[in-house]
Swiss-Prot record:
Pfam families: PPR, PPR_2
Name under which the protein is recorded: Pentatricopeptide repeat-containing protein At4g21705, mitochondrial
Family recorded in the similarity comment: Belongs to the PPR family. P subfamily.
Cellular compartments per GO CC: mitochondrion
InterPro entries, sorted: Pentatricopeptide_rpt, TPR-like_helical_dom_sf
Keywords, sorted A to Z: Mitochondrion, Repeat, Transit peptide
Location in or out of the cell: Mitochondrion
PPR repeat residue numbers: 125-159, 160-194, 195-225, 231-261, 266-296, 301-335, 336-370, 371-405
Highest taxon of source: Eukaryota
Length: 492
């Protein structure tokens, strides 16, 4: 459903900042960096007050809003609860609705129901009823959602498109797309005006049912309504489904209409259109929109570069992708390996593993972080071409890359191929070192010992008995392949 969502103005505004601004310590600046969901924000709130610093309701509400936007729901709930319990803010139905929604996100609708039931009657209005409906819809509880919806209608609380949109989202999320248009029709019959989002949900439903004709009809309906202002997102959503349906000419028409409604400095909008043009294979349009985005958005964030690079790689425009990567390097943006890795993957896709390896080596030489997965990707490309010496070299590098708390397990096919090669070609010392590193990633297996035995036999076989004992200790049984390898020893 992400394609349907409205892009909030504050998300667009957040793309721009002044690097020379003097940072002032605020409650927001104290809470915002606490990204660990297991850590509580209560100590920061209490410490702020105990130090005699002022706290405003407006700032607290802004903090809750920001934390919700960043999906830090537990922290947002803690701030909201602290506001209420300390009396800093006397909750109106609006604050109760936000709090109820957060409870539903963190603890589920059962706990949200309890909060709702304990509210005074004066606070049970369209906002709090709507928040509880959100909780039911989010957890896809159809029975409770529809019963609650009917109760809201009985109480006269269904006077805007928001509630109907929730029910349409419910049907979308459970895959009952055929019911979405019926809700839209009911909305019109009840003289509740649909908004752009209502129509986008409906367009999405028709798209899921491969009904391009009704998508076109919905667009015409919107264009006729004086209370609807057509926006770029609606045309873009429709264009996506025309691309899916193979009607590329109509898709291009809709993309042009979408572009004409883009607001300046709307980088997210340009990014979305770039990805759709890439799906159509239209390199000129991708580059044209990228140039426009650079003109109107004076600062490009890493996500912008990622979007255009992924689009260029998708249409095999690697030369242009290299140029964009050069722009990114000189942009002053913080380093993000995903950006160069997009081009690296593009090289691999075009059997240019030497260039991919060279880029990784350049990054490592300049002290920039890479990932074992990227080195493994290059190693796999070499192995598939039979260039196993290069595959071995890349795998050694991959095993030496710091992965932190993440777990990385190289593919078994690649590991088996490299072990077989290094057993035949590498020194015993090389094999010992490689196997020791590999064991830390995937544990021990028979192929590791076969590589060690083969290498040792080539160097005289002085350690065979020790290796066989180690196999036994590791509970690895000698099989027919092991016996064949052992038979290659020279007789004493």
């Amino acid at each position: 459903m992400n394609i349907l969502r409205r892009i909030p103005a504050n998300l667009i505004a957040s793309r721009y900042y002044y690097t020379n601004r003097v940072k002032k310590t605020t409650l927001y600046s104290k809470i915002s960096p606490l990204g660990d969901p297991k850590s509580s924000v209560y100590p920061e709130l209490q410490n702020w007050v105990q130090c005699g610093k002022k706290v405003s309701v407006a700032e607290l509400i802004r903090i809750v809003h920001d934390l919700r936007r960043r999906k830090r729901f537990l922290h947002a709930l803690e701030v909201s609860k602290w506001m209420n319990e300390t009396g800093v803010c006397v909750f109106s139905p609006t604050e109760h609705a936000v709090h109820l929604d957060l409870i539903g996100r963190v603890y589920g609708f059962v706990t949200a129901e309890e909060y709702f039931e304990n509210l005074k009657e004066q606070y049970k209005n369209d906002k709090t009823y709507g928040a509880l409906l959100n909780c039911y819809v989010r957890q896809q509880n159809v029975e409770k959602s529809l019963l609650h919806f009917e109760k809201m209608k009985e109480m006269g609380f269904v006077t805007s498109s928001l509630t109907y949109n929730n029910i349409m989202c419910l049907y979308t999320n459970i895959g009952q797309h055929e019911k979405v248009p019926k809700v839209l029709e009911e909305m019109k019959e009840e003289n509740v005006a649909p908004d752009n989002y209502s129509y986008r949900i409906c367009i999405n439903a028709f798209g899921a049912m491969y009904d391009l004709e009704r998508i076109g009809g919905t667009l015409r309906d919107m264009e006729r309504r004086q209370d609807i202002t057509m926006d770029w997102n609606t045309y873009a959503v429709a264009a996506k489904f025309y691309i899916d349906g193979g009607d590329c000419d109509r898709a291009v028409e809709l993309l042009k209409m979408s572009e004409n409604r883009l607001e300046k400095k709307d980088g997210e909008g340009y990014n979305h259109l770039i990805t759709l043009y890439a799906r159509l294979g239209k390199k000129i349009e991708v580059l044209r929109l990228w140039d426009l985005e650079k003109d109107v958005c004076k600062r490009r964030i890493n996500q912008d570069y990622l979007t255009v690079l992924q689009s260029l790689v998708k249409i095999d425009a690697l030369v242009e992708a290299e140029e964009v990567l050069t722009e990114w390097k000189s942009s002053g943006n913080c380093y993000d390996f995903r950006v160069p890795n997009t081009v690296i993957r593009g090289y691999i896709g075009k059997s240019m593993e030497e260039k991919a390896e060279a880029m990784l080596e350049d990054l490592a030489r300049r002290g920039k972080a890479t990932t074992p997965e990227s080195w493994e990707l290059v190693a796999t490309a070499y192995a598939e071409k039979g260039t196993l010496e290069n595959a071995f070299k890349c795998m050694k590098t991959a095993l030496g890359v710091e992965v932190g708390s993440r777990k990385w397990r190289p593919g078994l096919t690649l590991v088996t191929s490299v072990l077989s090669w290094v057993g035949d070609e590498g020194s015993l010392k090389e094999v010992e070192s490689f196997v020791a590193s590999l064991r830390n990633c995937i544990g021990v297996n028979k192929q590791m010992y076969h590589a060690l035995v083969k290498a040792d036999i080539r160097e005289g076989g002085r350690n065979i008995d020790t290796l066989l004992q180690r196999m036994k200790d590791d509970k690895i049984e000698i099989d027919e392949e092991t016996t064949v390898i052992l038979s290659t020893r020279s007789p004493c």
